[in-house]
Amino acid sequence: MFRASSFHTIDPKGRIIVPARFRDDIRAGGADGVMVSILDKALYAYTFNEWQAIEKKILSAKSEPMRRFKRFFLGNACECLCDKQGRILIPPSIRAYAGLEKEIVLVGMLDHFEIWSREQWDRENNLMEEELEKKEVREAIASLGL
C-alpha cells in the first residue's frame, strides 16, 4: 500500500526518483514499473496488477461521459518502468498536463500514488483546508471514525 508523501525534483529529462518504500509496493504489484495517467491536474501511478483491475472496471462503462473519460484516462496512460537507479521517466505530454517542472510531490493513496507539481499540491492542500470548514465534510470524515 502506498502511504505518506515525499518531496522530490524532476530532472531535465523528466525522470523522478521513486522512494524505496514505493518501489517495494510497485514490485509487489506485478512488475518493476507503473502505469501512469492524468487526472485532476496530477499524474496517477498504478501497479500493473491494479491497472488491470481498473481496465476491467472501465471496460463496462458505456455512457457517453464515460466513453469520453476512457479516451482521456486510457488514451493518456503511459507505461513507466523503473531504471536501475529507481527512477521512472515521465513522458513530456503528461508532464506538461500536470505542470511538472522542478519541484514535485509524490503522494501515497493506498492503491496508487499521485505525482503533483509542488505548486499545484500547495493549492490542493489549501482547498482541503477550506473544505474542512464545511460541516458536511467534517461529518463525512467523522463517519470514517477519524
Swiss-Prot record:
Subcellular location: Cytoplasm, Nucleoid
Protein origin, superkingdom: Bacteria
Keywords annotated in UniProt: Cytoplasm, DNA-binding, Repeat, Transcription, Transcription regulation
Annotated ranges, domain SpoVT-AbrB: 5-50, 77-120
Keyword Transmembrane in record: no
Record GO terms (molecular function): DNA-binding transcription factor activity; transcription cis-regulatory region binding
GO cellular component, one term: cytoplasm
InterPro entries: MraZ, MraZ_C, MraZ_dom, MraZ_N, MraZ_sf, SpoVT-AbrB_dom, SpoVT-AbrB_sf
GO BP term, example: negative regulation of DNA-templated transcription initiation
Pfam family, one: MraZ
Subunit structure: Forms oligomers.
Similarity section: Belongs to the MraZ family.
Full protein name: Transcriptional regulator MraZ
Gene designation per UniProt: mraZ
